[in-house]
């Protein structure tokens, strides 16, 4: 009987270890991405569908490109009258607590968003957890920080930059820990959140899109295209 019990306990322990290893394997480690070429082992491009609701465009892989300047460029284009294509790049793996940094130059135009964020949700079989750095193209002298925990948001915070982010590259970051999120601009702390902190690992995402029905937030998109957001590099340091 003791031997049978030992076998059962050992089997359960090995099973749990397997589950733990599987979860760990799905969560990526520290890395630096210079965006000199496209790494399909690390990234994937959204293609052929729309998020709907306030997103007034279709994601196209062709709207994510690498330039001769050694940067990733996301494009907002119009293939036909009043139809719009946009660009989104996201990690293959999910990532958890740590420091997320990006050196980027957002697009400038009313009615659009350029972003850097982590996201996971029901399509991944998890709660909707998200941490955002967003630039509203109507005023790129400000940056918006936000986060969602199990679908609950309303944590928006605007920070004045003291410069126009669309004119030159700057470094933006957030340090995500179990009890806090801290957002930085060029190494300077701009905002700290300490309540309802998300816990589920998410994919690293960057996108450029035009909105509809959210004019109070973004302003009305005027159809100007092509428009570009530029990403020089990004880095994740696991903590």
Swiss-Prot record:
Keywords: Disulfide bond, Glycosidase, Hydrolase, Signal. Beta-glucanases of Bacillus have a substrate range similar to lichenase of germinating barley. Belongs to the glycosyl hydrolase 16 family. Residues 26-239 form the GH16 domain. The keyword Nucleus does not apply. Its EC number is 3.2.1.73. It is an enzyme of class 3 (hydrolase). The active site is at 134 (nucleophile). One of its GO terms (biological process) is carbohydrate metabolic process. This is Beta-glucanase. It catalyses: Hydrolysis of (1->4)-beta-D-glucosidic linkages in beta-D-glucans containing (1->3)- and (1->4)-bonds. InterPro entries: Beta-glucanase/XTH, Beta_glucanase, ConA-like_dom_sf, GH16, GH16_AS. SUPFAM superfamilies: Concanavalin A-like lectins/glucanases (SSF49899). Disulfide bonds join 57-86. It comes from the Bacteria. The keyword Disulfide bond applies. NCBIfam families: BGlucanaseBglS. GO terms for molecular function: licheninase activity. Residues 1-25 form the signal peptide.
